[in-house]
Every structure is written in structure tokens, then in C-alpha cells.
């Protein structure tokens, strides 16, 4: 009979209560020294390893843990260091500077990890000298062994690593070939240290481009085979279906497949005989990306099916558990809903229940989880009726007519300036919000504080000279969680944190029921801010696509239905702001690109649904109300036409780390709506120079009509320090003023 063992692909770095984030940020703020940081991080790594061992995993991953990002770790391992940072000792401080930038150099680009809300640091190949630096992966493997944890190393594979890179004169194949001897050196050291197998992550092999990479993929793994490493390697895929027949033909010991997000195709290939049954099948059967409890009976049946096609099966999550919170243990949720949830440790418990059932005929834990799932499923969360057809999905007039009405109302100057929405969330801001949520201060005291911060920042913006202002979003912990707290159908957890990028953690709400707007969400603060200035203040909302993509979505209702329910709720808030006299309303969609399916066959429907939902949320307003949107952290080339179809009066896009790449996208489309391409990187503490901002503006104006162009930072300023914000915005405004003066001088008399 086929043996069943358990494994994991990766575990959350943050810690139950964000201990990882707090330690790293304390080091950045010089509140602790490097020795104390190392101790705190070592303690957390130890806790993670032992916690996974506690759930009886047969093999625990090492190499998934990182001080910032595992792709950046791989870059440093192989000396793929940006030219501007070369010549320094390869250590954690270098890692942080590459990721965040410093006063002398800009940070490396930050891009979404496939279709998730995690972000990786893009490796740069310009003028690099690849070699193996200190093998941190070996250190972590040996550390796990010292704790008596049976571990397997995890490393991103050469095909995926090169695909996620940029720069350099070499071809794709040449870069892979350059890395192969370095991978061999690292892998051999791990095998020599006793690694039973090594998880080689190759998620790029589930994308449309995977067929184009088959030749170089075979060359790479043939190389490892000739080095005697083949039996120790497991090619791990996730997030979509893979070409099982091709991957099974490679000389490796095992193949990891996603049986949750593959739309059923991986199972069909297995049943068709495409899997080489002499290899180990690493079956991703527990959802690594969502927080709902597994249908444990369905998983049992899936394993029984797979047993007919593989001699050895390892059951595991469908992807790294990096994308879900650590544990439900510290939550105080309504039991009827909590029974339907499963965070990282609960997912490991589900694996343990299945392992016990199959290997030991022990059904106690399985029966308990099955009963719990059935109790949750017996409830009904579909209670509301919606009339989607009653809300318009197009504006009353085309953009040229709307622009005339808006220009007449707003009286904005040439190259209008604005920010994206948020201002620094200082320790004081966070303390007041926490004290209010925990009922340590009154509503009146909290509202008085919010009004004082709003007033202070309205004055700061006026003094700097910005043209369209914002209230600062001091009442919001997160741009999605805030709406999750106020819309019906959402659940907000207490400790449900996940890593977004670097030390930035978000707490995605859980959508469990029908979504409904019940009262104004943002009107009070926005109207107060507008009362303090004659300049327009933007209403700040998050769009339906982003709210859905940055939440843990329900799975009992089609995705499009949930998205449109959210759109109707946002439409209600847009109208409430307009009725209150707000002239400019921004509906952010930073996650529109991130949700794009990895397979192009699904793109058209996804984008059509996304555009429809955005227009459902924004089309009820009058022509003179200016609708803005914002997008960030993404590669936009694939969706540039959909961006245009949103028909937003103004879109601001995060581009500072890859400005040239985005400008190229506009060469293929005559973009005839308002647009601001972010002119400096807010993720870095570095203050931009006037020359840098002027260059960014000039480059943009080569492709974009000046009358349509806005000047703004590339993202919200929530994570920056107050002085950094003031200094950077002052440089921005001063640069624009000089551009205006120069343009006026060049106009014919």
C-alpha cells in the first residue's frame, strides 16, 4: 500500500504577534543592535521549526525563513548584487539596503510574487560576477538538525530565479547556465550534510511561458543528474497546473503539484497516466493561500485516488503557508465562524489527521475535523438579494466632456500635484487607535485626536504647496481591513497577520457572508478635512477588486458575485461623499494586476469582471466629480488596455523602481485619460533630488499629454517618517514649480 507522509513548503515568518517585524524594525530604528536582532530572529526561527515538528511533520522546510525576502536571499547567495551596491561585505545590512535603499542609492524593484499579495525584490544582473557567497541555507539546515528537527532545504530553482530577474546582457539560457555550477555547489553541500531531499521551487513552470522553458529546464536538471544529485531533488510547483508529463520525465526524485488551485487539471493528468509512479508525488492538497478549513472527507478521497498512481505520496499544503496567519489559538471569534477557519498551524493539524488515518488507522482527529467542517457547512451565509442591473456601469458623459466640467470646478494648475492618500502612521497614531479599540479612551478623545492630526497635515500640505490634498487616513490601520471592519459580511481577526513585503504586515479580513453597506464609512473625516481648506480634498476609498484580492475570500459563492457585492457597497460610499460636497474621490485598485490568473486563457474574463466591478463602484457620480484610482507594485504591460477601460478620470501608478519599463507600455497605447506616474520611491527613506524628479517627469511627458499628467509619489506615505515625507514632497513641489515656470517662459507671447 502507498505510504503517506507529511511535509510543508514554507511557514509564516512574522510570528504569532509579529515578533519578526518588531525585531527588524527596532534594528532599523537603532533601538537594538545587531547582536540582539540576531538573537530575536534565531529565537523565532527556532520556535517556527519546533512548532512544525509539534504537528508531526515528517519533514520541515528550512530556507523559507528570511530577514526580508527569500528571492533576495538567493540573490545574495549567488552574488547577484546590484551594481550600485557592489564592493561591500555581503551581510544583513547589505540585504536591507538593497531592499529599502539608502541615502546614496535607490532600492531594487519590488514586484508581486505571482498572483499573491507577497512581494519579492527583483534580482539585477547588470555587471554582476556570480559566485557562491556564504551558504546560509546550509547553516539553517544544520541548525534544524541541532534541534532534532527532520528538515529539508528549500531553494528557488534556477529557471524561476532567472525568470524573476532583470538586466544583464546575457540571454535567459546563458544566465541559467552561469548559475548551474553554483547551484551544484550549494546543493552538494546540503546533500553532504545529510539532506534527504531538497525542495527546488519552480513556480514559473505553471505559467504560460513554461513551454518555452522546457529545453533549458531539461538542460538544467540533466546537469544536476550528471552531478549525482537527481534523486535528492524535488521540483516543486504551485498556484496553477503544471505539465505533469514533462516534469515527470526530468531526472529528479519527486514532483510537487498543487491540487487546490489547478482547476482540476493536475489530477486529470495524474489519472491519465502522465505521472511517473516511480517518483515521489508531493501532493498539495491543503489550501496554502486561504483560511477556510479543509473538507477533510474530500481530501481523504483525493488521497485514495492518488494512491492508485504513485508508490509514495507526501501530502502537504498547496503552497507555502507564508500567505496565511500563524494560528487561531489567540483569536476570540464567534464559534460558528471560527469552526470554518484554518490558519497555518490548523492546516498542519489537518495534514496530521490524514496521516494518522491512512498510516495508523487512527480516525479520532479526522472524525473531529470532519464533524467541525460539517457543522460550519450546515449554516447559511447567503441571505441578501442584489439588483446589480440598477446601478450604472458607465459614466454619464465621455472623458473630454467630464474633464471640461472638472476643470471648471477645480481650477487646477498645469502639472497638478497630489499624494496617494496616507500619511505617516506614527507611534502616537497607532497608540491612540489601539487605546480606542481597547476602550481605554473615549470616542470623544479619539475623534479629537484624529481631527488634530487631520488639521495638522492639511496645513502641512498647504504649506508645501500641493494642489489636491488628502486627510491622511489616520483612522485606518490598513486600506482593506478598515473597510472589512465596517461592511457587513466581513470578519476581522485580532492576530491574523501576513507578510506583504519586507517588514510590512497586513491583516486581511475574512469574507464569510453577503456584503452590504449599512452607513457612511469615510464621510466624517473627509468632510472635516475639506472644511479646513479651499483646495480640493480627495475622498479615499479602496476598490472592490482590491478588497476582494486582499481579503480571504469566501469559496461558497462565485468570485464575481462577491466582487460585485463589494462594488455596490463602494458605490454607496462614493455617492455619500459626493452628496457631502467632496469633488475628488479616489477608489484605489492596487491589487487589480495581482489577481490576474497565471494562465492567459483566464485573463479576458478576469479583466472584464474587474473592469465591470470598478465601473459599478464609480459610475453613478456626476460629470464634475473627478474619479481617481491608484495601482502599485505590479507589472502593468498585460493589463494596460484594461486600465484604460476603467475610464477613471485620473490614475496614479507606482513606477519609480521600474519607470522605464512602464513608459514602454504606453508606447503601444494612446492613453487619453488623466495619469500620474509615481516620480519617487516611497519604500525607501532616501529623499529624491530635483533632478531625479525632473527626469521622471520629462520621460513621462514623452508619451503622455501634458494636460493629462499629474505629479505624485508612487504610493501612500504611511510607512515613512514625517521629516522624510515633508522633505520629499517639498522637492516634488519645487521641481513642478520650476517646470511650470519653464513652460510659461517657452510659450509664445
From Swiss-Prot:
Positions annotated as active site in the UniProt record: 683 (proton donor)
PANTHER family for this protein: 5-METHYLTETRAHYDROPTEROYLTRIGLUTAMATE--HOMOCYSTEINE METHYLTRANSFERASE
Cofactor(s) annotated in UniProt: Zn(2+)
Known pathway: Amino-acid biosynthesis; L-methionine biosynthesis via de novo pathway; L-methionine from L-homocysteine (MetE route): step 1/1
Purpose: Catalyzes the transfer of a methyl group from 5-methyltetrahydrofolate to homocysteine resulting in methionine formation.
Keywords, ordered alphabetically: Amino-acid biosynthesis, Metal-binding, Methionine biosynthesis, Methyltransferase, Repeat, Transferase, Zinc
Species this chain originates from: Staphylococcus haemolyticus (strain JCSC1435)
Residues at which Zn(2+) binds: 630, 632, 654, 715
Gene: metE
Record's protein name: 5-methyltetrahydropteroyltriglutamate--homocysteine methyltransferase
Amino acid at each position: 500500500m502507498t505510504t503517506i507522509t507529511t511535509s510543508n513548503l514554507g511557514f509564516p515568518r512574522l510570528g504569532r504577534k509579529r515578533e519578526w517585524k518588531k525585531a527588524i524594525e527596532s534594528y532599523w530604528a537603532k533601538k537594538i543592535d545587531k547582536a540582539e536582532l540576531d538573537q530575536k530572529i534565531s529565537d523565532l526561527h527556532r520556535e517556527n521549526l519546533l512548532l512544525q515538528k509539534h504537528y508531526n511533520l515528517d519533514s520541515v522546510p528550512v530556507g523559507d525563513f528570511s530577514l526580508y525576502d527569500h528571492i533576495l536571499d538567493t540573490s545574495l547567495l549567488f552574488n547577484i548584487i546590484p551594481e550600485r551596491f557592489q564592493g561591500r561585505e555581503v551581510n544583513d545590512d547589505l540585504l536591507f539596503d538593497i531592499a529599502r535603499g539608502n541615502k546614496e542609492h535607490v532600492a531594487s524593484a519590488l514586484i508581486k510574487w505571482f498572483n499573491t499579495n507577497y512581494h519579492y525584490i527583483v534580482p539585477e544582473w547588470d555587471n554582476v560576477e556570480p559566485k557562491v557567497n556564504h551558504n546560509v541555507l546550509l547553516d539553517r539546515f544544520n541548525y534544524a538538525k541541532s534541534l532534532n528537527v527532520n528538515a529539508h532545504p528549500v531553494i528557488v530553482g534556477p529557471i524561476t530565479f532567472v525568470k524573476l530577474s532583470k538586466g544583464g546582457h546575457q540571454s535567459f539560457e546563458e544566465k541559467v547556465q552561469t548559475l548551474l555550477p553554483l547551484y551544484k555547489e550549494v546543493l552538494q553541500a546540503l546533500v553532504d550534510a545529510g539532506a534527504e531531499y531538497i525542495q527546488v521551487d519552480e513556480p514559473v513552470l505553471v505559467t504560460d511561458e513554461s513551454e518555452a522553458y522546457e529545453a533549458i529546464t531539461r538542460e538544467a536538471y540533466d546537469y544536476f543528474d550528471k552531478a549525482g544529485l537527481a534523486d535528492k531533488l524535488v521540483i516543486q510547483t504551485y498556484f496553477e497546473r503544471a505539465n505533469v508529463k514533462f516534469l515527470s520525465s526530468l531526472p529528479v526524485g519527486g514532483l510537487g503539484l498543487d491540487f487546490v488551485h489547478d482547476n482540476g487539471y493536475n489530477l486529470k493528468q495524474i489519472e491519465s497516466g502522465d505521472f511517473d509512479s516511480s517518483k515521489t508525488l508531493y501532493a498539495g492538497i491543503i489550501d496554502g493561500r486561504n483560511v477556510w478549513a479543509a473538507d477533510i472527507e474530500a481530501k481523504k478521497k483525493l488521497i485514495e485516488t492518488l494512491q492508485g498512481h504513485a508508490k509514495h505520496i507526501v501530502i502537504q499544503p498547496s503552497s507555502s503557508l507564508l500567505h496565511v496567519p500563524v494560528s487561531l489559538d489567540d483569536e476570540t471569534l464567534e464559534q460558528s465562524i471560527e469552526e470554518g477557519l484554518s490558519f497555518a498551524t490548523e492546516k498542519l493539524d489537518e495534514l496530521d489527521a490524514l496521516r494518522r488515518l491512512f498510516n495508523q488507522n487512527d480516525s479520532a482527529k479526522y472524525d473531529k475535523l470532519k464533524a467541525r467542517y460539517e457543522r460550519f457547512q450546515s449554516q447559511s451565509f447567503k441571505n441578501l438579494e442584489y439588483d446589480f442591473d440598477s446601478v450604472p456601469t458607465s459614466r454619464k458623459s465621455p472623458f473630454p466632456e467630464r474633464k471640461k466640467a472638472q476643470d471648471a470646478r477645480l481650477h487646477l494648475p498645469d502639472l497638478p500635484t497630489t499624494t496617494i492618500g496616507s500619511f505617516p502612521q506614527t507611534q502616537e497614531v497607532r497608540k491612540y487607535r489601539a487605546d480606542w479599540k481597547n476602550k481605554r479612551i473615549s470616542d470623544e478623545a479619539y475623534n479629537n485626536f484624529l481631527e488634530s492630526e487631520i488639521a495638522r497635515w492639511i496645513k502641512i500640505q498647504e504649506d508645501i504647496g500641493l494642489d489636491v490634498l488628502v486627510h491622511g487616513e489616520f483612522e485606518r490601520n490598513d486600506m482593506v481591513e478598515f473597510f472589512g471592519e465596517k461592511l457587513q459580511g466581513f470578519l476581522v481577526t485580532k492576530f491574523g497577520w501576513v507578510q506583504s513585503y519586507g517588514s510590512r504586515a497586513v491583516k486581511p479580513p475574512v469574507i464569510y457572508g453577503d456584503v452590504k453597506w449599512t452607513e457612511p464609512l469615510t464621510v466624517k473625516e473627509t468632510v472635516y478635512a475639506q472644511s479646513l481648506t479651499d483646495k480640493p480634498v480627495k475622498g479615499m476609498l479602496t476598490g472592490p477588486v482590491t478588497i476582494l484580492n486582499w481579503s480571504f475570500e469566501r469559496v461558497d459563492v462565485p468570485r464575481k458575485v462577491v466582487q460585485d457585492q463589494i462594488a455596490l457597497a463602494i458605490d454607496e460610499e462614493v455617492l455619500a461623499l459626493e452628496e457631502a460636497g467632496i469633488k475628488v474621490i479616489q477608489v484605489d485598485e492596487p491589487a487589480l494586476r495581482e489577481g490576474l490568473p497565471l494562465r492567459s486563457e483566464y485573463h479576458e474574463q478576469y479583466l472584464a469582471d474587474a473592469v465591470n466591478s470598478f465601473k459599478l463602484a464609480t459610475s453613478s457620480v456626476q460629470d464634475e466629480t473627478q474619479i481617481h484610482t491608484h495601482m502599485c507594485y505590479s507589472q502593468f504591460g498585460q493589463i494596460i488596455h484594461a486600465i484604460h477601460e476603467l475610464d477613471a478620470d485620473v490614475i496614479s501608478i507606482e513606477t519609480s523602481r521600474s519607470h522605464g519599463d512602464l513608459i514602454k507600455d504606453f508606447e503601444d497605447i494612446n492613453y487619453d485619460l488623466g495619469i500620474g506616474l509615481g516620480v519617487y520611491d516611497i519604500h525607501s527613506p532616501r529623499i529624491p533630488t530635483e533632478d531625479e524628479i525632473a527626469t521622471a517627469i520629462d520621460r513621462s511627458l514623452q508619451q503622455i499629454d501634458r494636460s493629462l499628467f499629474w505629479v505624485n509619489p508612487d504610493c501612500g506615505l504611511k510607512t515613512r517618517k514625517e521629516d522624510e515625507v515633508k522633505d520629499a514632497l517639498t522637492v516634488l513641489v519645487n521641481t513642478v514649480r520650476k517646470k511650470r515656470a519653464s513652460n510659461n517662459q517657452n510659450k509664445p507671447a
